[in-house]
């Protein structure tokens, strides 16, 4: 702790050395970041960061160890393994590793699916609302992504998926737990069953909705081959904090790396350290798992309240999701439309060829009652 205190003292000591112009630049950045603290912030998945998480970010910066040379950092390795075991327990997988985000995780999972497939097919199925990183990954890997239509709830239509699988057996099926657009959850059990019938890889992109696993609100996930989760979205953690979990072990790379004591695993990431997981570790260490669960429950409760307020007080079209995103469409554009979008209070998306408003409850500080009242301010 003395080293941490010394670092904090050093930071405090250099503050008076900043010129007025430098201080103004720093203040402008801090002021810009305050947008995430607002009880009206519901435009996007960026969260406010708790003090315990901020401490973990500072610890990672001070430590700065590179786990490609894991033998030098046994404490860091131990913390990483503790967290991975925690994730595996909640998501019913057997091993995994941290990544810089689910865009990287989705690419790696499809890489594994492609290279370990016993078929010649290159087709990957996912919903029409699948995250764009899946489409990018398929382009990079030479795979053929084919979108499956969604139902009126924004979920992948399981009948359409079944029909597609009968016509062309896929290499992989992507199931999303919390689409970025509407927060919808694809029919997981149907995806598992079809993947098993087709001997295809089933990957779950739970970047946004993975927090539901902590609430025991997801089905048996052990049938998935791989799962991505982004704590920097649903767990209110600092970026980057993402994890990619696998049901089966990964082999080592068949590449000579004479300067390393251990042969790297066949994963996308190279150099990394505590920046990917120490903030989350600090959060769990200092506030506990139950605090994280309460955070998820509180933000989902506010999303539910916001949906209820719209249904009880308007005749607007409104779409509720279990992951904390509420989409709605008033009869006419809101009076303060531009300000709502500019201030990050709401965002827009497309649903069934209509432009709709989107409220993302990423923070448990977002207050549904205040947010609803803001819609009618002139």
Task: Report the location of each language-model feature.
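Short acidic-aromatic active-site loops that bind/stabilize oxyanions
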Residues: 69-77, 99, 103, 177-181, ...
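N-terminal entrance/gating region of PLP-dependent enzymes' catalytic architecture
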Residues: 1-93, 346, 354-357
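Active-site lining segments that contact anionic ligands and/or coordinate catalytic metals
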Residues: 170, 197-199, 224, 238-241, ...
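Predominant activation on well-ordered alpha-helical scaffold segments within soluble catalytic domains
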Residues: 56, 81-85, 107-111, 135, ...
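Glycine- and acidic
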Residues: 64-71, 93-97, 120, 145-148, ...
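Conserved PLP-enzyme active-site core in the AAT-like
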Residues: 101-254
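Conserved C-terminal alpha-helix-loop-beta "cap" of PLP-dependent enzymes
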Residues: 24, 28, 257-268, 290-377
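Active-site C-terminal subdomain of aminotransferase-like
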Residues: 217-314, 320
């Amino acid at each position: 702790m003395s080293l941490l205190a010394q670092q904090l003292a050093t930071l405090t000591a250099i503050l008076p050395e900043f010129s007025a112009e430098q201080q103004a630049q720093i203040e402008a950045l801090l002021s810009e970041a305050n947008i995430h603290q607002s009880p009206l912030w519901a435009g996007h998945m960026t969260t406010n960061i708790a003090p315990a998480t901020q401490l973990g970010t500072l610890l990672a910066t001070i430590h700065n160890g590179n786990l490609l040379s894991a033998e030098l950092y046994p404490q860091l390795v131990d913390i990483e393994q503790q967290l991975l075991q925690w994730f595996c327990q909640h998501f019913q997988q057997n091993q995994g590793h941290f990544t810089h985000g689910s865009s990287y995780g989705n690419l790696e999972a499809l890489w594994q699916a492609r290279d370990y497939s016993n078929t010649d097919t290159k087709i990957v199925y996912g919903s029409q609302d699948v995250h764009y990183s899946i489409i990018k990954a398929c382009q990079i890997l030479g795979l053929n992504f084919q979108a499956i239509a969604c139902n009126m709830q924004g979920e992948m239509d399981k009948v359409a998926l079944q029909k597609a699988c009968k016509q062309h057996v896929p290499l992989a099926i992507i199931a999303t737990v919390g689409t970025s657009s509407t927060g919808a959850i694809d029919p997981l059990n149907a995806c598992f069953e079809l993947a098993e019938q087709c001997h295809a890889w089933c990957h779950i992109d739970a970047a946004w909705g993975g927090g539901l696993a902590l609430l025991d609100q997801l089905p048996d996930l052990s049938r998935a081959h791989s799962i991505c989760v982004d704590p920097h979205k649903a767990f209110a953690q600092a970026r980057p904090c993402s994890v990619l979990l696998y049901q089966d072990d990964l082999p080592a790379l068949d590449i000579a790396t004479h300067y390393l004591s251990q042969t790297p695993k066949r994963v996308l990431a190279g150099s990394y350290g505590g920046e990917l997981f120490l903030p989350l570790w600090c959060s769990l260490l200092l506030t506990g798992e139950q605090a994280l669960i309460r955070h998820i429950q509180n933000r989902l409760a506010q999303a539910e309240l916001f949906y209820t307020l719209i249904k009880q007080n308007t005749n607007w079209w409104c779409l509720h999701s279990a992951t904390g995103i509420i989409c709605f469409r008033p009869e006419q554009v809101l009076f303060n439309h531009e300000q709502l979008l500019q201030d990050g209070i709401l965002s827009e998306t497309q649903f069934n060829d209509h432009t709709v408003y989107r409220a993302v409850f990423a923070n448990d500080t977002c207050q549904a009652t205040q947010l609803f009242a803001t819609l009618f301010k002139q």
